[in-house]
Regions:
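Bacterial N-terminal signal peptides
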Residues: 1-8
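Glycoside hydrolase catalytic-domain context in secreted enzymes
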Residues: 8-733, 742-753
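Surface-exposed, short loops/turns at beta-strand junctions within beta-sandwich domains
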Residues: 738-740
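Short beta-strand elements
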Residues: 755-764
Length: 764
């Protein structure tokens, strides 16, 4: 039977094979042959933890027997093409020969690691975002992966949440544009091509709104705020044709996301028209028991009935759904719906036509970590850095200078990777020391000192650094984190600084300090590294801080005392080269923040598109009694959304409207002239914001509705235009109707959310 299905699939032309009518006929015929248990088996996603991950798969393994019996629809976590072929061969030996899908977390590259997604978002370059997904898909498919658990599109307003590193920041409009770019890059124009993968949009929904920034925590949002402030990136991904979604760990309105009918069915499918399937996050079905809504059988029934199609890692569907159907607790139509959607995904991927379509012998050695991948990673990292401060134009540095490069992240290859890096070649990252020394070869000099520990508390540093290893390899011996006294490390760095013209300090977070399960209540640069910075400042030498981080940090001392701050995030394999490119001016920095940097953790959650209160207070104004502000800090962030410096300067004309009235069917052009007033060519991201002055519901003080990244040569002026329609002015009102309300709107254009010029537009 397996051979018959495969050969019949190969008979038609590509257009016929991938046509919807042909697909529906094929799947309907296949499902008629499937037992209830086999249908439920398609709803089961198992992990590589089930198997011994070596070259040999035991025929006696329970998991292999389940696979042959059709009890698994997909597997995740495998990156060895030989193993993937072996497992697919086992699946094809089953009664109906239904191929497996192979999924994996490909968050910012596979073998070649790109900058973390938060860093990529600060490029504001949608072409680069799309290309990053396309390049990652090439590596993923080269090892046999055809389904990636990306993009992560959760909006986050609270930097305490570690998974802010995986998303695009705090703005739902920008997040939506970036989500579409990722989907286009991963899926291309033909899912059955051997270099495209099916995207899995996560974490649906509202996971980034976790209370107090504590991972997996409850989410408390109204439906109106959810739609206006958080859901747009998920919506845009659906409209872009994303093939699958992943449900989130959190609850919404008292119902876990993995069994939330409002999210899974009413919004995703009925309102947005999503046609693909939804998989749970890892063990999220079982975790609903801890939420207190039922035992394993109950949560499995509730999940599939609400619209969850695939269970990742809980084995709850396989364990309980057949009996639930027979007893009437679950309608068989729910099983059929989910099974059909998963079979459709396999069909669209071309797996029925050729289950081994990605597994071309030797392709992995050609595609992985090659020159093109490394070159692209460097280019992407160049545009994913944000210059926060540059007092007296200290940067760019001269390559003839004597540079003291110090800090625990200056020569640390593995810590360039960032969280959720999948590469098995982390040690081949270009360190910042390597990058700078290559750049100055034959001219200046770069001396190096480690400078400090990460934390003064060795036990805490060990918990953070080795946390994952202690979970997955508890018997593995681990080296001590502190081998040289802190005072000695600082003294060595100070000595290097005194002999240099300029000091570059590389400080911030190690990989495990951000990402999943990495919530923090203190967002300062860790204490040991602060000791180092203060000692370096005392030398009187110019101080450049290179910030390696996966989230916004509180940088009050650094902003006051450092001469320059370059926020380089976690940039991946080409970090050292890209940082050197920017520090020496071979590349003019053009990144702009997509998330606010707080002055104090007490300001969180903090976001530019907040609403006014009945007692508003200017963000930068000092404390005043009986208005909405703090006694001890201004409302404004230290660095605002959209902010980022360049080695040149730009000036803006006042924005102009083609008409001051906007009809229901018409459009208005907003134009502004931007002049490069400096001496270097540079890229500028021109941003357009709106504000509904009077509305039936309260509205944010600003909302991003457009941006253009343009290259402007020194001394030249470019006219930048935006086209607005009433669609751009719409929001979800109190009744959740998506409307543009007539009246006056402020249209704001500028270089960031704070530095804007305004004009008024009337919507009819």
């Amino acid at each position: 039977m397996a051979m018959v299905i495969w050969l019949c699939m190969g008979c038609g032309s590509s257009n016929t094979t991938h046509g919807e009518a042909e697909m529906n006929r094929f799947i309907s015929q296949l499902m008629k042959k499937m037992t209830l248990e086999e249908k439920i088996g398609q709803l089961n996603l198992a992990s590589n933890w089930t198997y011994v991950t070596n070259a040999t798969l035991s025929e006696e393994d329970v998991a292999i027997k389940q696979l042959k019996e059709g009890q698994m629809g997909a597997l995740y976590g495998f990156t060895n093409p030989k193993q993937i072929r072996q497992l697919q061969e086992v699946a094809m030996q089953g009664r109906l020969g239904i191929p497996l899908m192979f999924g994996n977390d490909v968050i910012h590259g596979l073998t070649t690691t790109y900058p973390i997604p938060l860093a990529i978002s600060t490029s504001w370059n949608l072409d680069l975002v799309e290309e990053s997904a396309r390049m990652a898909a090439r590596e993923a498919t080269a090892v046999g992966i055809n389904w990636v658990f990306s993009p992560m599109v959760d909006i986050c307003r609270d930097a305490r949440w570690g998974r802010i590193a995986e998303g695009a920041g705090e703005d739902p409009y920008l997040g939506g544009e970036i989500a579409k770019a990722y989907v286009r890059g991963y899926q291309g124009t033909d899912l059955a091509a051997d270099t495209t993968v099916m995207a899995c949009v996560k974490h649906y929904a509202l996971y980034g709104g976790a209370e107090a920034g504590r991972d997996y925590n409850s989410v408390f949002l109204s439906r109106q705020e959810a739609h206006n402030g958080f859901l747009n990136p998920y919506k845009q991904a659906a409209l872009a044709g994303a093939g699958s979604y992943m449900s989130a760990f959190n609850e919404f309105e008292g119902v876990p996301a993995s069994c939330n009918d409002y999210l899974l069915t009413e919004v995703l499918r009925q309102q947005w028209g999503f046609k693909g399937f939804v998989v749970s996050d890892a063990t999220a079905v079982n975790e609903m028991m801890a939420h207190g809504i039922g035992d394993q059988a109950e949560v499995a029934c509730r999940a599939v009935s609400a619209g969850l199609d695939m269970d990742m890692g809980s084995n709850a569907f396989v364990a309980h759904l057949a009996e639930a159907v027979r007893s009437g607790r679950v309608k068989e139509a729910a099983i059929d719906r989910a099974c059909r959607l998963i079979l459709e995904a396999k069909y669209k991927l071309g797996l029925f036509e050729d289950p081994y379509r990605y597994l071309v012998k030797g392709r992995d050695s050609l595609e992985l970590f090659n020159e093109a991948q490394r070159g692209f990673a460097r280019r992407l990292a160049q545009e994913s850095q944000v210059l926060l401060k540059n007092e007296g134009n200290l940067l760019p540095l001269k390559k003839s200078a004597r540079i003291a490069l110090v800090g625990p992240l200056a020569d640390n290859a593995a810590e360039m990777q960032g969280s959720w890096a999948a590469s098995n070649r982390a040690g081949e990252s270009v360190t910042i020391l390597q990058g700078l020394r290559e750049a100055v070869e034959g001219r200046g000099s770069v001396s190096y000192a480690e400078g400090s520990w990460i934390f003064l508390d060795a036990a805490h540093e060990e918990r953070v650094k080795y946390g994952l290893l202690k979970i997955f390899r508890p018997d593995m011996p681990l080296p001590p984190v502190h081998t040289v006294p802190q005072q000695q490390l600082v003294a060595q760095a100070v000595a290097a600084a005194r002999s240099a013209d300029v000091v570059v300090a590389c400080v911030g977070e190690i990989n495990n300090m951000n990402g999943e399960g990495a919530s923090r209540t203190n967002l300062d640069i860790p204490d040991a590294q602060q000791q180092l910075l203060k000692a370096l400042k005392a030398t009187g030498k110019p101080l450049v801080v290179v910030l390696c981080t996966g989230r916004p940090l509180t940088l009050n001392w650094e902003a006051e005392n450092a001469d320059a701050i370059l926020n380089s995030w976690n940039l991946g394999h080409e970090a050292g080269h890209a940082i050197a490119d920017v520090l020496f001016g071979d590349v003019n920095p053009s990144g702009k923040l997509t998330t606010s940097f707080p002055r104090n953790v007490g300001q969180l959650p903090l976001y530019y598109n907040h609403k006014n209160t009945g007692r508003p207070h200017p963000d930068e104004a000092p404390y005043q009694k009986f208005v909405s502000c703090y006694e001890d800090v201004v409302n404004a962030p230290l660095y605002c959304f959209g902010y980022g410096l360049s080695y040149t300067t730009f000036s803006y004309s006042a924005p102009q409207l083609s008409s001051n009235r906007l009809s229901k069917e018409g459009s208005v052009t907003v134009s502004v002239e931007v002049t490069n007033t400096g001496e270097r060519d540079g890229q500028e991201t021109v941003q357009l914001y709106i504000h509904d002055i009077y509305s039936s519901s309260t509205r944010p003080v600003q909302e991003l509705r457009g941006f253009r990244k343009v290259m402007i040569k020194a001394g030249e002026t470019q006219r930048v235009e935006f086209t607005l329609t009433q669609e751009d002015l719409k929001y979800y009102n109190h009744d959740l109707d998506y409307v543009c309300e007539p009246g006056d709107y402020e249209i704001m254009v500028g270089s960031n959310c704070r530095d804007v010029q305004k004009v008024t537009l009337t919507a009819e």
